[in-house]
Amino acid sequence: MAAAVAGMLRGGLLPQAGRLPTLQTVRYGSKAVTRHRRVMHFQRQKLMAVTEYIPPKPAIHPSCLPSPPSPPQEEIGLIRLLRREIAAVFQDNRMIAVCQNVALSAEDKLLMRHQLRKHKILMKVFPNQVLKPFLEDSKYQNLLPLFVGHNMLLVSEEPKVKEMVRILRTVPFLPLLGGCIDDTILSRQGFINYSKLPSLPLVQGELVGGLTCLTAQTHSLLQHQPLQLTTLLDQYIREQREKDSVMSANGKPDPDTVPDS
């Protein structure tokens, strides 16, 4: 009987070759959960805790170590151009003043630039990331503390300090920090004291006058002794002539005179 039932199922329920079954059974039930991590055995936990690697503490804290050097960056053409311009400014100008570049209006900046240009004083602005490396490698490295934030350079071929200070006084919110004149570093007070000095033609005139006076005094001192000697000789000759005339008039020698041997 079992064989007959199996034959009926094989013949009637099983699908024939090349045909899909009209009825398909689906299994419903619990599935294996693989999302949860399997708990480690307690003996293995003990073994892992005992054999855990403990790295040695460093002798110096990593925060105290110097940062690794950054890779050198390739210079672009603009930086090379600015560096050459900065080198030309410091080489061709005797006066270099450093000011704080405050937020001036375009009209005020243009007016001040025009007033400075009348006295052949030029206004230059360079980025600090290009200017500071140049100063570090030059003889002007003591000017580095002045370059904090946005700065402005006032340069001229001749030291026109008096004119520059007079123009900057009209702009009180543009502070003068310092600078250098003829490779001599000056502070703000040094620039003000320099502006109070007399002009070069006046000093040259005073120097020429002093030298002329000294020359005249030297000339008079050199002429004093010869003139005095000449006067004494003239007086001596005149006295001798008077004595000779007295002797010739009396016909006998003067008793005061002593004859030559």
UniProtKB/Swiss-Prot annotation:
Highest taxon listed in the record's lineage: Eukaryota
Listed GO biological process terms: mitochondrial translation; translation
InterPro entries hit by this protein: Ribosomal_uL10 (IPR001790), Ribosomal_uL10-like_sf (IPR043141), Ribosomal_uL10_bac_type (IPR047865)
This protein's UniProt keywords: Mitochondrion, Ribonucleoprotein, Ribosomal protein, Transit peptide
Stretch forming the transit peptide: 1-28
GO CC field: mitochondrial inner membrane; mitochondrial large ribosomal subunit; mitochondrion; nucleoplasm; ribonucleoprotein complex
Gene3D superfamilies in UniProt: 3.30.70.1730
Gene Ontology MF: a single term: RNA binding
Region span, Disordered: 242-261
Subcellular location: Mitochondrion
Principal location listed in the UniProt entry: mitochondrion
Subunit organization: Component of the mitochondrial large ribosomal subunit (mt-LSU). Mature mammalian 55S mitochondrial ribosomes consist of a small (28S) and a large (39S) subunit. The 28S small subunit contains a 12S ribosomal RNA (12S mt-rRNA) and 30 different proteins. The 39S large subunit contains a 16S rRNA (16S mt-rRNA), a copy of mitochondrial valine transfer RNA (mt-tRNA(Val)), which plays an integral structural role, and 52 different proteins. uL10m contributes a single cysteine residue to a zinc-binding site with mL66.
Family indicated by similarity: Belongs to the universal ribosomal protein uL10 family.
Name this protein carries in UniProt: Large ribosomal subunit protein uL10m
Native organism: Homo sapiens (Human)
Phylogenetic classification of the source organism: Eukaryota, Metazoa, Chordata, Craniata, Vertebrata
